[in-house]
Amino acid sequence: MSAKTDEILESLKSLSLLEASELVKQIEEAFGVSAAASAGVVMAAPGAAGGGGEAAEEKTEFDVILEGFEASAKIKVLKAVREATGLGLGDAKALVEAAPKAFKEGVSKEDAEAAKKAIEEAGGKVTLK
């Protein structure tokens, strides 16, 4: 590898998980690609190599994705998103209008389920990944 690629690799190794996640989002936006397909392949490989025991391991981090909402429930969904995320009105409105969109990432199962319940009670459709 060249010195430039070695330097980039070392920089990537020093990123926190949150910073790496933000970098992936920026790359997806800048190049118009999605990292979701390749991530699925990477996740499938360790389970296949490790045998059947690891494949049954329960997921510990979830992304909460607002898939959509009933038009009549937009304000209720907006309020529920604000409560779940702590976002301001403008940011929450932009997030709700951009559905489908993840509004919580890398959260525990309990937090994900609580957010899902609150949004669904307000009239939104939510999935956990």
From Swiss-Prot:
The keyword S-adenosyl-L-methionine does not apply. Keywords: Ribonucleoprotein, Ribosomal protein. One of its GO terms (molecular function) is mRNA binding. One of its GO terms (cellular component) is cytosolic large ribosomal subunit. Pfam families: Ribosomal_L12, Ribosomal_L12_N. Forms part of the ribosomal stalk which helps the ribosome interact with GTP-bound translation factors. Is thus essential for accurate translation. Homodimer. Part of the ribosomal stalk of the 50S ribosomal subunit. Forms a multimeric L10(L12)X complex, where L10 forms an elongated spine to which 2 to 4 L12 dimers bind in a sequential fashion. Binds GTP-bound translation factors. This is Large ribosomal subunit protein bL12. The gene is rplL.
